[in-house]
């Protein structure tokens, strides 16, 4: 009982302290996407984005020091990690609509996202070890005793809680703006942040740390997906309001910060 009371007191204290962090909250709320806003911008920039010269330019370094001494680095070493980094992909060219991900793969993907390691710590770094993120996932396959649907991941028990399995959950056109070649995902991860878990200590700067942590989660998912010959794609084009409504979160205290598609590509062979 005392442990429960201490948690409640800590949460209340964190909430009251975080109320002064208005800059990060204002920024986050004013940069949310909706279908109307995002689609208009995408149409305006389509010609530029499809230009080979533009794509070449974006892959070049911004800074170059021609008058300074240069040192050539060695080629990367061999091993599983370097192989996965080399083979990691974000684009699906030939989606496999009949792909089936078994329960072992599903378990490893959620564990890689935010699970606990052998030292009873999370598998990603977190500023102050505060772990402000929550992991949700839409699973598109039925298993023996496991139904497809929207789930929440509990790292402490390594379990999934079914939140919703209505038809609207699987209609990605309702909450993803652009999903060309991603019409047949196996899993969609939603990474959300409970901001007060970090802002009570770091104030507005906590927002930076939260995004860094979300990036580490997405990279872990990507590497585990590569291990299983899957493609992972981070999606910035979510309709944030629709996603938060589906997750049943308020969008203020807890809000989406990243989305990752997992799919099978017929051309992706390690």
PLM region spans:
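N-terminal accessory segments that position/regulate proteins before the catalytic core
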Residues: 1-187, 238-270
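Small-aliphatic-rich amphipathic alpha-helix that forms the alpha element of a beta-alpha
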Residues: 109, 135, 189, 195-197, ...
């Amino acid at each position: 009982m005392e442990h429960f009371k201490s948690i409640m007191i800590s949460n209340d204290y964190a909430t009251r302290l975080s109320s002064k962090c208005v800059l990060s909250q204002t920024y986050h709320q004013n940069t949310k996407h909706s279908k109307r806003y995002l689609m208009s911008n995408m149409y305006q920039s389509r010609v530029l984005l499809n230009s080979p010269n533009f794509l070449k330019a974006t892959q070049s370094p911004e800074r170059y020091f021609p008058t300074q001494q240069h040192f050539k680095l060695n080629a990367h070493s061999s091993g599983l990690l370097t192989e996965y980094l080399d083979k990691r992909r974000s684009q699906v060219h030939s989606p496999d609509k009949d792909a089936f991900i078994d329960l072992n793969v599903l378990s490893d993907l959620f564990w890689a996202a935010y699970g606990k390691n052998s030292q009873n710590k999370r598998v990603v770094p977190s500023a102050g070890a505060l772990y402000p993120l929550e992991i949700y996932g839409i699973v598109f396959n039925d298993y023996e005793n496991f139904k497809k649907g929207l789930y929440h991941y509990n790292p402490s028990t390594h379990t999934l809680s079914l939140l919703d399995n209505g038809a609207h959950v699987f209609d990605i056109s309702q909450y993803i703006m652009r999903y060309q070649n991603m019409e047949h995902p196996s899993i969609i991860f939603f990474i959300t942040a409970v901001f007060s878990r970090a802002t009570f200590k770091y104030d507005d700067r906590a927002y930076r740390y939260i995004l860094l942590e979300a990036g580490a989660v997405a990279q872990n998912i990507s590497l585990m997906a590569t291990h299983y010959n899957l493609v992972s794609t981070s999606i910035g084009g979510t309709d944030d309001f629709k996603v938060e409504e589906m997750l049943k979160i308020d969008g203020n205290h807890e809000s989406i910060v990243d989305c990752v598609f997992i799919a099978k590509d017929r051309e992706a062979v390690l």
